[in-house]
């Protein structure tokens, strides 16, 4: 132990550590003392409890030390979180973000047509749908255009819009890099990115914003809708809305527009049918609004008239009405009905001009003629007698 203490007392350095490492130290077994040997250690036992005064200054924070700040993860500094129910209201923003569609007719041969009255796009499956993006001021560098599809009705808005299992499993229209479950795709742009939100699982597609070319005021993005609206297991005849947003590279919203989409076999026919139904609905709504107003006016007019007196009603029965000389206009549809009613009117006018005595004489004369004519037709008619073989005429 003396040699070990002598070596340990040497100044510690890299060379002395090597000497200590090479030394073969013999471990000395230390036996615990017997119980009798603990008698001298009674003085080390605590006869009284430890009394320590509490120092409140230990928990005081000096004013010079900065307060601890909460840790911020990388998710907090990234793009803003996506809402569970995306907003569909239009928001042009400070840049005047707008959407335009090419003018097209309602012919049966068209593959894509837009109705301004309905704010609805009708297109066929996997056909090109050009959408023009217009801004009043250029967005910051790195801006992107996002397309997101959601269900229109509140009862279905929480569901994610996906393709039906049939169109996902077939090899047709599934050759590109886009995931098979995404409904909205971008055509002719290799820089498109297909996203799936980690919280809502909604599908969207992003393309970098491209400034308009020389001589043009809009940027065109070609979209495809890869499933019919009537597909079972997919949209299942549920109407959908497509939301187009202009965002910065960090995800800040710059503008938003939305429109309804119907994917069908004959876009022109369906657009024409829905526009006709919209006009009928508007006419019906207008009629229902005007009818109560007319009823209110009529009730007010009747209320403004004086109440009839019981004594005056007896006089009006004996005397002619005051309004007999008033002229009324009757609109009649059809010339035959007009001629018939005109004859009735002429006969009534003549009956008023003829005196009552002459009218009775004429009526009696017509009645006697009718009776005489009827009595004349009751008698037997004279006919020639038919000859029979056995009978002979007088000449024979």
Curated annotation (Swiss-Prot):
DNA-binding region per UniProt: 90-281
Residue ranges of the region described as Interaction with DNA: 262-269
SUPFAM superfamilies given in the database record: p53 tetramerization domain, p53-like transcription factors
Keywords (A to Z) from UniProt: Activator, Apoptosis, Cell cycle, Cytoplasm, DNA-binding, Metal-binding, Nucleus, Phosphoprotein, Transcription, Transcription regulation, Tumor suppressor, Zinc
Motif interval(s): Bipartite nuclear localization signal: 297-317
Entries under PROSITE patterns matching the protein: P53
Function summary: Multifunctional transcription factor that induces cell cycle arrest, DNA repair or apoptosis upon binding to its target DNA sequence. Acts as a tumor suppressor in many tumor types; induces growth arrest or apoptosis depending on the physiological circumstances and cell type. Negatively regulates cell division by controlling expression of a set of genes required for this process. One of the activated genes is an inhibitor of cyclin-dependent kinases. Apoptosis induction seems to be mediated either by stimulation of BAX and FAS antigen expression, or by repression of Bcl-2 expression.
Family: Belongs to the p53 family.
Record text about domains: The N-terminal and C-terminal disordered regions undergo liquid-liquid phase separation (LLPS) following homotetramerization and activation. Post-translational modifications, such as phosphorylation or lactylation affect the ability to undergo LLPS.
Designated name of the protein: Cellular tumor antigen p53
Organism the protein comes from: Oncorhynchus mykiss (Rainbow trout)
Encoding gene per record: tp53
